[in-house]
Amino acid sequence: MKTGLVLEGGAMRGIYTAGVLDVFMEQGLHFDGVIGVSAGALHGCSFVSGQKGRSIRYFKKYRNDKHFMSMWNLVHTGEVVGKQLCYHDIPERLDPYDYEAFLKSDTEFYATCSNVETGKAEYIKITDMLNQIDVLRASASMPYVSKLVDYQGMKLLDGGCTDSIPLEAFRRMGFEKNVVILTQHKGYVKKPQNAKMAELRYHKYCLLYTSDAADE
C-alpha cells in the first residue's frame, strides 16, 4: 500500500505546514508520494529534498523584503509575489535548494495547479525541480494578484481554485494511505467564490468560475 502526504495551501498559513514537515523529518518519516497545493507545494518540496528548517528560515529572513511578497511587487510587476527572488535568487543562491537530493529521492512529488481554460485541476508530477520550477510557481500563483503561468500549452493558476485538498485525486493515483496537513481550523467550509469578480478578472476563461466546472 502506497503512502501519501497531502498538503493544503493557505498563503502565510502554510508556515504551519512547514513546521509540521520539519518535525516529520526529525522523526524520519517517509512517504511514497507528496502532493501539495500552493504554499503546501512550496514547503513540500523542501520535505522531499530533506532540508529541515529551510522553509521557515528563508520565510523569516525575506518576509519583509518588498521583492518577496508585497503590494510594491503587485504595483510594479503585476504580481504580489516576486518571481525573481522567490523562484530563482533564493533557491539558486541565497538559500540553495538541494536539486540533487530531490532528483535522487524515491518520493514522488506533485503540485496541484488550476487550468483556467478547462476549469479543472492539473496534478503535475515534478521530477526535475530546477527545470520545472514554473509548475511550482503556477501552483502558488494566487488569483487576482498573479499572472497566468504558461506551461506545456496550459495556462495555470493557484491549485486552490479547483482542488484545495487533493486527497481523492491522490487516492486515484494509487496513494491509498494518506496523511493530510490542513491550514484551516476543524470544520472549516470554504465559501463559494465571488462569481462576478471572477468573471470580471477572468472573462476569457469562464470554466474557471462556473459552478459546473467547480463541482467536477
What would you call each of these model-derived segments?
Residues 1-37, 45-211:
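Patatin-like phospholipase
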